[in-house]
Structures are given as structure tokens and as C-alpha cells.
A protein has these predicted regions:
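NAD(P)H dinucleotide-binding glycine-rich loop of Rossmann-like/cofactor-binding domains
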Residues: 69-151
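Rossmann-fold NAD(P)-binding glycine/threonine-rich loop
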Residues: 242-260
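Adenosine-nucleotide cofactor-binding segment
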Residues: 147-150, 163-226
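Conserved beta-strand positions in the Rossmann-like core of class I SAM-dependent methyltransferases
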Residues: 46, 172, 238
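Glycine-rich beta-strand-centered segment in the early N-terminal region that forms part
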Residues: 2-16, 29-73, 81, 113-116
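C-terminal hydrophobic helical "lid"/dimerization subdomain
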Residues: 225-229, 271-321
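N-terminal Rossmann-fold NAD(P) dinucleotide-binding loop
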Residues: 157-158
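Helix-to-beta-strand junctions that scaffold the AdoMet/dcAdoMet cofactor pocket
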Residues: 231-233
Length: 321
């Protein structure tokens, strides 16, 4: 078992979600530097290294794997996830372990959040992906009565749809997986269809105008190109899914220019984002538990990854211990 450094803690993992980026690390060509698995863990504090911000053994917590320095140019501009410290901090050995150490810096910078009594470990394992979604929404100028297109009906894609619904925004969702299309529809998407019907649905939902924002919640280059075509004049395309390393997209730059379509991306989440996400879950504003379809023990992690990889009949897969 790892030891708690001074100011840090060791946590016994009780639940950890499998993310699409975990699958990309195992099976694909991940485009970010860290190759550690499991960045959505929650658990119980096992040991504390001296003064650790008031944390005590036995506390139920969510733990964020990355934290920013809070003082660099990126942090000053609200770009915490681009901070050099952010990518250098992590859990050890990783979140997908019986026990993992949380560095003192993570504790000091708000990377460990005590859980309200009524929030389960499984719900807490959904804090990080929801936080990532909320951060992406902060960069979108969408309000009540608008329409977003969500390309990709995986767990975060459906979270985007749920956020839209909570704000009075229509969500047209697409996916190549019929199971996930049906899942999105059941969880409140305004429309959920296969990609070949996506553009027509968006036009129908907006009177031909196009989506105010398109969230590409998949790493598919084809989906990115499709998304640009679905955006209205002056709309925004948000790259949210992780494209494999070396991905290229062919776009008509003249069309982007003439229609004033913006393309941007959103990576990960800050400590402030995780606090907001936990607050939404605790307040019942986003029912993340409905996304969990499969649970596996840590010893069954290989089977869990295969289930999550297939996706034909699975949404969120969570490792419990």
C-alpha cells in the first residue's frame, strides 16, 4: 500500500469509472501525455500524512487526479487545465487501484472533496466527467430556447444532453450505436438519431437555421466535419471527445470564414469545476446514477474494459471495490 506524504492522503478506492480516454490508452493512440488508468475515483481516506487540510481517516471523498498551480499565466486567465503543474500532478499509482496516494499539492489545491452523506461512491465517480462537461459549457454562448447538437451518445454525450435539458435548451443527439441512441432518448434528449439523420433533424428543430452549438463528444474526425456543417451562422463547434493522435480533419476554411463558425476545444476540468459538479449531483439536478449500466470488481477490470470498449449494450462501466 502506498504511504501518505506529508500533507497528502492515501485513499481506499471504492468506485472508479472507466472513461473513453482510459479505453484510448489501452486500445488506441491516446493524444495526451499521461498513461495512468482511472481518473474518476472516489473512496475512503485510509491514512493521512500530518496536516492534510482537515481530512481524517474514514472520510468519504472524491479525488481529482490533476490540480493547477493557481499562479501562472494560464491559471490567471482561467485556463487551469493548460497549466504545466496540472499535467504533472496525479494519483499514485493510479485511480484504478485498491489504494492510491493523493499528493499534498492536490489536497492543498482542492483536489479532494468530502462527500455529503447521501452521495454514493458510484455517484461520486461521475463527478469528474460531469465537471469536464460543465467546463465545456462555460465556453458556449447558449441559453434557454437554443438548440445544441451532441455528436456521440456515450456517457459524457448524454451528460451534455442532460445539462442542456436542465437549462431549457433542446438537444439533438447522434450516435452510430442504436443502443446508445435509444438510451439518449430515454434520458430526455429532444431528438436522438443515427448520424445520417442528424443534419436533417437539426435543420428541422431549428427552422433550417442550424445548431447554436455543436458538441462533438467523440474523437471521430468524421463527426467533427459533420458538426461544422450542422452549426448555424455564428455558431460554435466544441471538440470535446479525444481524437486519436495524428487525426486530421478536412474542412472548408472559406465556409468557416463566411459563416462565422467558431471551432474550439475543451480539455478536462479544474477544481472549481469539480466542486460545481458535486454540487449538482448532491442537489439532484443531474441524475448521473442513471448512466451506470455495469459494475465490476477490481479483479474483473479486464472484463470491464472489454465491456466498456464494445459499448453495444453498455453505457457507463464502473469498477467497485
Amino acid at each position: 500500500m502506498p504511504e501518505a506524504q506529508t500533507g497528502g492522503v492515501v485513499v481506499r478506492m471504492r468506485a472508479c469509472g472507466i472513461c473513453g480516454s482510459d479505453l484510448e490508452k489501452v486500445y488506441g493512440m491516446y493524444s495526451k501525455p499521461s498513461m495512468r488508468l482511472g481518473h474518476e475515483p472516489a473512496g475512503t481516506v485510509e491514512s493521512v500524512g500530518g496536516d492534510a487540510g482537515g481530512l481524517r481517516a474514514g472520510d468519504r471523498v472524491f479525488t481529482h487526479h490533476h490540480v493547477s498551480c493557481g499562479s501562472c499565466r494560464h491559471c490567471a486567465r482561467g485556463e487551469e487545465t493548460l497549466c504545466a503543474t496540472y499535467s504533472s500532478t496525479n494519483l499514485s499509482p493510479c485511480g484504478l487501484a485498491e489504494h492510491y496516494a493523493v499528493p499534498a499539492l492536490n489536497v492543498a489545491r482542492g483536489g479532494v472533496l468530502p462527500l455529503p452523506d447521501h452521495v454514493t461512491f458510484e455517484q461520486a465517480a461521475m463527478v469528474e466527467p460531469l465537471a469536464c462537461c460543465l467546463r465545456a459549457w462555460d465556453a458556449l454562448e447558449c441559453g434557454e430556447g437554443d438548440t445544441v447538437a451532441v455528436l456521440g451518445c456515450g456517457p459524457t454525450g448524454i451528460m451534455h444532453s442532460m445539462i442542456a435539458r436542465s437549462r431549457g435548451i433542446a438537444a439533438v443527439c447522434t450516435d452510430t450505436n442504436d443502443y446508445r441512441v435509444d438510451f439518449a432518448r430515454e434520458l430526455g434528449a429532444t431528438e436522438a438519431v443515427r448520424p445520417e439523420r442528424g443534419a436533417d433533424c437539426v435543420r428541422g428543430a431549428t427552422g433550417g437555421r442550424g445548431a447554436d452549438a455543436v458538441i462533438v463528444a467523440t474523437g471521430s474526425a468524421r463527426a467533427i466535419a459533420d458538426g461544422v456543417g450542422m452549426a448555424r451562422e455564428g455558431g460554435t463547434v466544441m471538440l470535446f471527445g479525444v481524437p486519436p493522435r495524428g487525426s486530421t480533419v478536412e474542412l472548408d476554411a472559406g465556409d468557416l470564414y463566411a459563416r462565422g463558425v467558431g471551432v474550439r476545444s475543451s480539455y478536462a476540468a479544474s477544481d472549481a469545476d469539480t466542486r460545481r459538479a458535486l454540487g449538482m449531483i448532491a442537489g439532484g439536478r443531474i441524475d448521473v446514477a442513471r448512466l451506470i449500466t455495469h459494475r465490476y470488481r477490481l479483479a474483473e477490470a479486464g472484463e470491464a474494459f472489454e465491456r466498456a470498449r464494445g459499448g453495444e449494450s453498455a453505457m457507463k462501466v464502473v469498477i467497485t471495490e
